[in-house]
Amino acid sequence: MKNWRITHISDTHNKHNKINLPGGDILIHSGDISSIGRKHEVESFIKWFSKQPYKFKIFIAGNHDLTFDSEVLFRDKSVHFDRIQYFEPPVNGKPQWLIDMLNRLDKDVFYLENSSIEFDNIKIWGSPISPSFGYGWAFNKDRGYDISEVWNGIPNDTDIVITHSPIYGYNDRTSNTNQNVGCADLYHRLHEVRPHLHFAGHIHEAYGWGQIPYKAEWGDIYTFNGCSCNLRYEVDNNPITFDYNFITRQLNFI
């Protein structure tokens, strides 16, 4: 199997036009494509993302992309009245304009929502879910049973896992609390699945990568936090690009 050139970005928050990408085989975006998921924000991102010079382009949503999980607007009255003004019209479920956009994606662009795709014998699963915090955010699940039910849906033969949330202890430390806020339940599930690569975002100040050790005969998993924006929502981090061989598990940064 050939080396695959992979680029990872995340948490672009409407700043995608300020990002220059080198091109390659696979482009992955780990969510928070927008500020709050308004139509013009999503439309601008998809137009930009679709034009990038990659063979396959994959994205998920994040907690900011409210219209992808717009039932959040109806879970709490304060959220409803605070944010309903931004959506046209208010709906319980994905708005029709978003459904239409996702149905019209180019054949080389994929949106994953607790779902999988496969190409060239590479199996990829993606999810917008992250552990609950605050109120009114999209795709939040309580830690423990609720979020584990989502992670249990990751097929055991998955090669690449894409989530908005990082895993616990890897590129997940916040600067204001100095605590690791990633998902321990996801960490345990990845140890069961043993994918090659894991891509996440969400914690802007925790940009970077790490290796999760497995048994020697399995090889390590590489995990990445590709947040493009810093805490001030300024594009401050470079896209993460590397060549990867799924047979030898060899990774070389570009």
Predicted segments with their positions:
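Active-site neighborhood of phospho(di)ester-bond hydrolases with catalytic His/Asp-centered motifs
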Residues: 8-10, 27-32, 58-63, 112-113, ...
